[in-house]
Amino acid sequence: MALLSVAPLQKPLTSCSPFSTTMPTLGVCTPRKVVTPSIIMCSTTAVSDAGAKRRIANHHSNLWGDDFIHSLSTHYEAPSYRERAERLIKEVKEMFTEIEDGLSITPLSDLLSRLSMVDSIERLGIDRHFKMEIKSALDYVHSYWSEKGIGCGRESGVTDLNSTALGLRTLRLHGYPVSSSVLEQFKDEKGQFATSSIQTDGGEIRSIFNLFRASLVAFPNEKVMEDAQIFSTIYLKEYLEKIPLSSLSRQIEYVMEYGWHTNLPRLEARHYMDVFGYNEMPWMSYGNTEKLLELAKLEFNIFHSIQQRELKHISRWWKDSGFSQMNFVRHRHVEYYTLASCFAIDPQHSAFRVSFAKMCHLVTVLDDIYDTFGTMEELQLFTAAVKRWDPSATDSLPEYMKRVYTVLYETVNEMAQVAKKSQGRDTINYARHAWEAYLDSYMKEAEWISTGCLPTFEEYYENGKISFGYRISMLQPILSMDIPFPHHILQEIDYPSRFSSLAAGILRLKGDTRCYQADSARGEEASCISCYMKENPGLTEEDVVNHIHGMVDDLIKELNWELLKPDCNVPISSKKHAFDICRAVHHGYKYRDGYSVATNEIKDLVMITVLEPVPL
């Protein structure tokens, strides 16, 4: 939302300098070079030119100086690293062949061995090299799937919780039609989940761990998955309080921290490399385990060199845009790029990562203009200019808006040209309609502020799903990919599809729970929390926040279904990046509004996944 503001445009207030320290967060304990920013907060009151009263938010300035970004270097671009990785890829494919031929496993363990192999490769972030092998392994497992689940092997004789839970999760994530009802048979007369009596303590813990992981991909109305999550959460928390630190305990801590809907594949890979070892797949030789780990580290570092190249492009775009001269907006281009590169980890998807970072930064700039800095008259002029979509539309705009409009116009058109090459058709009208709807939703919020109106919860929520900007951050980036998005598939993903509505709803609700207090302090009263409290005066603020969290949990299950439902006309691969945008942005709201205050977990994420390679 927007309106009255205070402060003239000024030069950027920051720069950053690197120094050596130890990373204290996210379970990565190796010493590394980090960037400690100089945090200078923008003032909250001032008078701009022409005497217009303006508000500005108390946002800290850019943490990552352009000079620092362009000083980054790496030696992992050398061909020798790529050649070594290619040799290891061939050797891992041979491991799959040995499993297929039964050379390294027996009929008593062939199902769990396949599942463990697929699971480890995915968690190490190298699964893109083994799509055919993974499909073959999962087809094999699914061929032995029954209403009671599976055992460790096709000749096990009895089903077990560990194999069934891991199978349920993995098969479901790959679109196989598997029912959660298989878990019912593992509940005892008290409703508790029981593991095999012959399992060791470590085996029992791993079974409950995989039960918890399976429960995270629940669909709506799956009571057994709700029971599984409650039971496994209590069990694992008690376990973590009792035992010393170990590889398994660190895995449990990570998954309980990030789950699936705030997990980022590159962050998970970085963490898993530190705990991956022989115990993950005891049937595999030590040498083969080391090869998997070496490949994961090489791939991580080779991609690190790609990140540096793309990040320099983003930083140059940001500097050339003139946004660095605007101290009333948040400068989070590096953070947005980091999120993109933490889930779009295929090197070929460079256009997606760059487009996502640019779109998100444009959304943030406009959010700060419409929410705080712009006057009502200026916002009306800017909205009208975007609807004209003509370079000459800047004539009626104030100086600071002219530059914003020009960068928006040029960037959107440039992305449309990229999409035209990948999709084989002109997509500029998709983008224009999305931006028009986005700015219209902002104008509605600006009117609420100017009139002191507090809308109904439903009115605010429906408008807020558009004003959050999910559609903007998703549409042009996915169209830049080499995945075809014909009109009928795009309709299933883009607004106002069920998929898009759920993803945007999750982010609007979650974002409001993190931002509503700061927004209210700036005069932006309307939020999911305030609107719901108005309609339910008997509830406390805490009651409403808890209710909103419950709504988010329900929407997540519905989004799971929209992504993973079997026999769908839209393949999972077509929806996956749109889904991953939702969970990446959700990640930024896990502890706080990580986009307004990017000095904590998000800063750590940049350092761990972008700035530093993993030691080989």
From Swiss-Prot:
**GO MF term list:** 1,8-cineole synthase activity; magnesium ion binding; myrcene synthase activity; sabinene synthase activity; terpene synthase activity
Which top-level enzyme class is recorded in the Swiss-Prot or TrEMBL entry? lyase
What pathway, per the record? Answer: Terpene metabolism; oleoresin biosynthesis; Secondary metabolite biosynthesis; terpenoid biosynthesis
Q: Where is the transit peptide?
A: 1-41
Q: Which catalytic reaction applies to this protein?
A: (2E)-geranyl diphosphate + H2O = (S)-alpha-terpineol + diphosphate; (2E)-geranyl diphosphate + H2O = 1,8-cineole + diphosphate; (2E)-geranyl diphosphate = beta-myrcene + diphosphate; (2E)-geranyl diphosphate = (1S,5S)-sabinene + diphosphate
- The record places the motif (DDXXD motif) at 367-371
Q: Which GO terms describe its biological process?
A: diterpenoid biosynthetic process; green leaf volatile biosynthetic process; terpenoid biosynthetic process
Q: Summarize where Mg(2+) 2 binds, as residue positions.
A: 367, 371
Q: What task does this protein carry out?
A: Monoterpene synthase (TPS) involved in the biosynthesis of monoterpene natural products included in conifer oleoresin secretions and volatile emissions; these compounds contribute to biotic and abiotic stress defense against herbivores and pathogens. Catalyzes the conversion of (2E)-geranyl diphosphate (GPP) to alpha-terpineol and, to a lower extent, to 1,8-cineole, myrcene and (-)-sabinene.
Domain notes per entry: The Asp-Asp-Xaa-Xaa-Asp/Glu (DDXXD/E) motif is important for the catalytic activity, presumably through binding to Mg(2+).
Q: By what name is this protein known? A: Alpha terpineol synthase, chloroplastic
Q: Which organism is it from?
A: Pinus contorta (Shore pine)
The gene name reads TPS-1,8cin
